[in-house]
Amino acid sequence: MCMVILFDQYNLPTDIYEIIFATTQQVEVAKMLINEMKVKGGEIGKTEMSMFATALHDGKDIEIVTGEGPFRKKKKENISYNKRQFYDRILTPMKTMGLIDYDLYKKTYKISEKFNKNMMRVGLMWLQDLRKPPIK
């Protein structure tokens, strides 16, 4: 599986999730997942992940903040996300990009810094290609 990230360097969102995910619902679900993992010390088990996905499938209340600066508004909203789609569109891409690691032996998901290292590697690949002589 290959994830493609397209962004406009002149209108780069300040929120990393908005760069990675296509829809606002995916952004909210990804934020909820990372927050849940942070609350649990950055690591959750396979069963806890399944319970999180089931809770999303059944519907979960969240607080959404809209607007900028002093004009921010908070509103409560119920978010529901299909369990299979959660694994396909949120968790699997986060694992393949290096945002989340899965330990096969401990059967746990852990927040990872590999995404940052991979992005630096992509930048270096671009610089190397830039410095290559032209093809004749």
Regions inferred by a protein language model and the residue ranges of each:
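Minor-groove-contacting beta-hairpin "wing" of winged helix-turn-helix DNA-binding domains
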Residues: 107-112
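Structural motif
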Residues: 103-105
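DNA-recognition alpha helix
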Residues: 45-75
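Long, low-complexity, charged/polar intrinsically disordered regions in eukaryotic proteins
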Residues: 1-42
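Short, amphipathic alpha-helical interaction segments positioned at domain boundaries
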Residues: 114-136
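Short amphipathic alpha-helical interaction segments
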Residues: 77-97
